[in-house]
Swiss-Prot record:
Any single GO CC term annotated in Swiss-Prot or TrEMBL for this entry: Holliday junction resolvase complex
GO biological process, one term: DNA recombination
SUPFAM superfamilies: P-loop containing nucleoside triphosphate hydrolases, Winged helix' DNA-binding domain
Enzyme class: hydrolase
Official protein name in the record: Holliday junction branch migration complex subunit RuvB
Keyword check for ATP-binding: yes
Subunit architecture: Homohexamer. Forms an RuvA(8)-RuvB(12)-Holliday junction (HJ) complex. HJ DNA is sandwiched between 2 RuvA tetramers; dsDNA enters through RuvA and exits via RuvB. An RuvB hexamer assembles on each DNA strand where it exits the tetramer. Each RuvB hexamer is contacted by two RuvA subunits (via domain III) on 2 adjacent RuvB subunits; this complex drives branch migration. In the full resolvosome a probable DNA-RuvA(4)-RuvB(12)-RuvC(2) complex forms which resolves the HJ.
């Protein structure tokens, strides 16, 4: 494909206000994640199947002295996709360049990134489903045959240049794998689905993070916090920071179960890890639409969230834990949702 060079890539940060959001909220939280980030697969907690498979692929690539095949990581936000990309690069002993789909505004931005890679390096693109179509098309030849075609010069001096690229590994991360085009998806040789973490796995993460934060947490408090963290390490670490604040104000040297429960109540995180937006979504379906079915566009308009946020951030957890069902006609709440909200279950439900 022939494209034009453009200016430098602009990095974009996105914010989310919900304490149980799986998204990174601000630069401070991004720095916190860096401090907690494991360096090796052995240090990486959870995702046992993914770790086992990636360990084999990495060892094989190193033995052949080849670039690792391109990797697609998909699943809800906050499950460690970015962290795993850094771990993979570290295990390979190569450099990693990180960007996101929305940050690559023009095809030339991607060309600049690709041209700066050394043999075997990793290019990590978060939110890869949000790449613009012209940018995505540049990736096809780059991923498959390690080359790009660019146009340089102006007017009569314009000419096309074939630019070979060193063998590299593209790691793409997405919360919405279904939005990837088939041509792009088919070029990933390794596709890994990131699963929600178990309470035991999150408990270990909470204990490890408390050590990094130079604080102490009682085992039963760590368990309760893990239980309400939506199966998501990022949520667990965020809640731990807030609970730590409550404990410090109370003068506790070790975070207790009582303080943890009080703090989570203050933060409006209920016994199942549901937050205000979760409950608003469920109540809207129940009180406005008799429990559903309700279309995603209607839901988004009613609760003031965009459709992508609902689909990537809220629905996966509500589905996984049996609060809603997806039907051909839309979303429906389950009996469990009525019980969690303290509402009577309709006779015909």
């Amino acid at each position: 494909m022939v494209i034009l060079f453009s200016e430098e890539v602009k990095l974009v940060a996105e914010n989310d206000d919900a304490v149980t959001s799986g998204h990174v909220e601000n630069p401070e939280e991004e720095q916190m994640e860096l401090s907690l980030r494991p360096q090796t697969l052995d240090q990486y907690l959870g995702q046992k199947r993914v770790k086992k498979e990636m360990s084999i692929y990495i060892k094989a690539a190193r033995q052949r002295d080849e670039a690792l095949d391109h990797v697609l990581l998909y699943g809800p936000p906050g499950l460690g996709k970015t962290t795993l990309a850094f771990v993979i690069a570290n295990e390979l002993g190569v450099h990693l360049k990180s960007t996101s789909g929305p940050a690559i505004e023009k095809a030339g931005d991607l060309v600049a990134l690709l041209s700066d890679l050394d043999p075997g390096d990793v290019l990590f693109i978060d939110e890869i489903h949000r790449l613009a179509k012209p940018v995505e098309e540049v990736l096809y030849s780059a991923m498959e045959d390690y080359y790009i075609d660019i146009v340089i010069g102006e007017g009569q001096t314009t000419h096309a240049v074939h630019v070979p690229l060193p063998p590299f590994t593209l790691i793409g991360a997405t919360t919405l794998a279904g939005q990837l085009s088939a041509p792009l998806r088919d070029r990933f040789g390794i596709v890994e689905h990131m699963q929600y973490y178990t309470v035991d796995e999150l408990e270990k993460i909470v204990q490890r993070s408390s050590d990094v934060f130079h604080t102490s947490i009682a085992p039963e408090a760590a368990h309760e916090l893990a239980r309400r963290s939506r199966g998501t390490p990022r949520v667990a670490n965020r809640l731990l920071k807030r609970v730590r604040d409550f404990a410090e104000v109370k003068g506790e040297k070790t975070i207790s179960l009582a303080t943890t429960s009080d703090a989570l109540k203050q933060l409006q995180v209920d016994s199942e890890g549901l937050d205000q937006t979760d409950r608003k979504l469920l109540r809207t379906m129940i009180e406005g639409y008799n429990g559903g079915p309700v279309g995603i566009r209607t839901l988004a308009a009613n609760i003031g969230e965009d459709m992508e946020t609902i689909e990537s951030l809220y629905e996966p957890y509500l589905l996984q834990n049996g609060f809603i069902l997806l039907t051909p006609r839309g979303r429906m709440v389950t009996d469990k949702a009525y019980l969690q909200l303290g509402l009577p279950i309709p006779n015909d439900n």
